[in-house]
Amino acid sequence: MSGGPGRLRGYAMVGGSAVMFGATGVWVGMTDLPASTVLSLRMALAAALVALFGGASRWRRQSRAPGVGRRLLALGLLDVVQLYTFFLALRHLDVALAVFLSYMSPIYIALVSPRLLRQRTEPVVVVALVLAVSGVIVMLSPGLLDPALRLSVPGLAAGVLSGVTLAAFFLVAKTLSADVDGSTMLISNGVIVAVVMLPLGLIQWAGGGFPFVLTDFWAVLGLAVFSTALGGTVFLHGMRYIPVQHTSIVGLLEPACAPFFAFVFLAERPSLWTLLGGALILAGAVLVVLFGAAQDGLAGTPEEAVGEAEATS
C-alpha cells in the first residue's frame, strides 16, 4: 500500500465505520416507529452525544471559518434529500432495486471527481469499482431478477436521485474534510436533519398512535451511537486521508457486512449470492487499499484511466 501512516489510518477509519454501518438493519428491525421519527431522534441524539463528548467547542470554532458554514449547510441538506428519496424509493420499488440505485454513488463519483476535485481516476479504481458494483448486483440479483419486481417512474426517479445526492454528499464532505473535523460535520448534519425531519416525525408518530416501548429506545440508541455518532464521525474524519473515489468503494463494505450482523443477531442465513457478492465487494476494497496511488490531487478522467488499464494489461 502506498502512502504513510495517515493513509492507513484513513482506510481503517472508513472501513471500520462501514462495518459498523452494516449493523444498521439490525437496529432498524427492532422498532416499528415511522422512519421519519427514527431519523429525527437518531440524528438529534447523535449530534447531542458528539457535542457532549468534546465536539461542541470544535464545532463552534470551525463552523465560523470562511466558507465552511455554507458547505456544512449544503452537506446537511444533501443528507436530508438523500435519506428522504431513499425512503421514497423503498416505498415505490422493491427493496433490492431501491438499494441498488442508492449504491450506484461510486460510479457518479468516479465520473465527476476528476473534474470537480481534480483527483485522477487510477486504473485500479476502475477495476475495484467494477468488482464492488458487481458485488452489489450479485448480492441483490435474486430480487432484481424476480419477475414480480415492483417498478414505478416516481420510484426510479427517487432511487436515482438518492444515489446522486449520496455522491454529492461524499464530494462536499471531501471538500470540508481539510477544514473541519468529522465531529463538526456530524453535529451540523445531525442538527439539520433532525430539524427538517422532526415535524413529519412527530405528525406520523402521533397520527399513527405508535407506542414508544423499550425496544424502540434501544433501537434509536444503537442507531445514534454506533451508526451515527461513532461510525459517522470516524467515517467523515477518515475521508481527509484518502481520495474520495477510494472512500466510496471502501464504503461499500457496509452492504457486504450487513448479512454477517443479520446472521449473528437475527439468525438469518446468508445465501450463496450474498456471500459471493460480499466477496467481490471485499476484493474491490482490498484493491484500492493495497494498490491505490497516494497522490490525491492529480487530474485525469475515467476514460483516461480505462485507456491506461488497457495499455498495461
Q: Which residues does each predicted region cover?
A:
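Small-residue-rich packing faces within the transmembrane alpha-helices of Major Facilitator Superfamily
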Residues: G22-A23, A47-A48, I107, V133, ...
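Specific alpha-helical transmembrane segments that line the substrate/conduction pathway
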Residues: T37-A48, F87-R120, S162, V244-F263
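Hydrophobic alpha-helical transmembrane segments of multi-pass membrane transport proteins
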Residues: V19-A23, W27-M30, F53, L73-L88, ...
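Glycine-/small-residue-enriched transmembrane alpha-helix faces in small-molecule transporters
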Residues: M1-S40, L77, T85, A148-T175, ...
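Hydrophobic alpha-helical transmembrane segments of multi-pass integral membrane proteins
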Residues: L8-G16, S36-F53, V124-S134, P154-L161, ...
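Membrane-interface capping segments at transmembrane-helix boundaries
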Residues: W59-R60, V289-E303
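Hydrophobic/aromatic residues within transmembrane alpha-helices
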Residues: T31, V38, A89, L101, ...
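Hydrophobic transmembrane alpha-helices of multi-pass small-molecule transport proteins
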Residues: V50, G54, T121-G143, M197, ...
